[in-house]
Design a protein with these regions (language model features):
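A short, acidic, amphipathic alpha-helical segment used as a generic capping/interface helix at domain edges
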Residues: 116-125
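A short, structural micro-pattern
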Residues: 77-78, 125-127
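P-loop NTPase catalytic cores that bind/hydrolyze ATP
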Residues: 126-147
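Conserved P-loop NTPase motor cores
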Residues: 1-112, 119, 139, 146-148
């Protein structure tokens, strides 16, 4: 799998993309961490101009941290136009996503204004029927549409 992934990345890196005649390529890397460490940061930064997008799928950010460093994982996520979160069990992952989504103005029980996470860290592990899409303009909470139901 690693050899094939590497060859695809190399092909796209050298590809001369003409948006008038060439089709865009979507590279979906499921169980991303299981592929092992390879140079993904450079392709992530420049694949869009080569007519390609990378979709990294993983069960946990901790899986990526085991293969890449936490800093490399942050660079990967920072270069992602969209992040889709189905759920998160790890407390540091939940905190990270809550910080990424940001805070909203709210009120406490006495009516005083306060800023709270738009999505509380505990909520991430309770997503059974919803998902969150994080993008440059903010976030959106969507209902999951199960094909098998």
């Amino acid at each position: 799998m690693r050899v094939i992934s590497g060859q695809v990345m190399e092909y796209i890196s050298g590809r001369i993309y003409d948006k008038r005649k060439d089709k865009r390529i979507l590279v979906a890397l499921d169980e991303f961490a299981s592929i092992g460490h390879f140079e993904v940061l450079s392709p992530f930064r420049k694949f869009r101009k080569n007519g390609a997008n990378i979709c990294i799928l993983t069960q946990s950010l901790a899986d990526i941290d085991l293969v890449y460093s936490e800093k490399e994982r942050r660079v990967i996520l920072d270069n992602s136009a969209y992040i889709v979160v189905l759920s998160a069990n790890d407390s540091s992952t939940r905190q990270y996503f809550s910080e990424l989504v940001g805070r909203e103005q709210g009120h406490d029980k006495r009516g005083n204004e306060k800023r709270e996470f738009a999505v509380q860290p505990e909520e991430w592990k309770e997503f059974t029927n919803h998902l969150v899409v994080i993008h440059a303009g903010g976030y959106v909470k969507l209902k999951k549409n199960f094909y098998f139901k």
